Amino acid sequence: MAQIAVKEKFMGTWRLLECYGSWSDGRISYPYGEDPEGQLIYDGRDNFSGQIVGSGRRPFQTGNLLKGTQEEIKAAFEGYIAYYGTYEVDESKGQVTHHVVGALFPNWIGDVQTRDFSFEGERLRLSTQPIKGSRADLINILLWERA
């Protein structure tokens, strides 16, 4: 019964408040800038959808999606991430698992991504497991607020 209650807390639409990387050597990084926007949706049928838009993205000069320069296309890709699929909640581990069906980054398709979670009132904190780096380990942290 408790798992149902926790899963129900996920359901709905969430607005991104913060997105940053915390390195084991003390550094903080902002992969989508210091003021990104984003939306995360969990429904009652185990589906999710998430998007993050980097701050400072610039429009293509031509105004045409198919006629951007290589630099414009690269910047647009690097400043945005989107993915969707199904999810499951493991309350005992404090984890939500995303089974990726589609994503802007093709390597994520078919991937399983597990995030640690905690709720603080109407806020949801998601964080990755430590990612091994050459100099330090990284944990990506996203703080969401119910929209």
Question: What do the predicted segments below correspond to?
Answer:
Residues 1-147:
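Lipid interaction determinants
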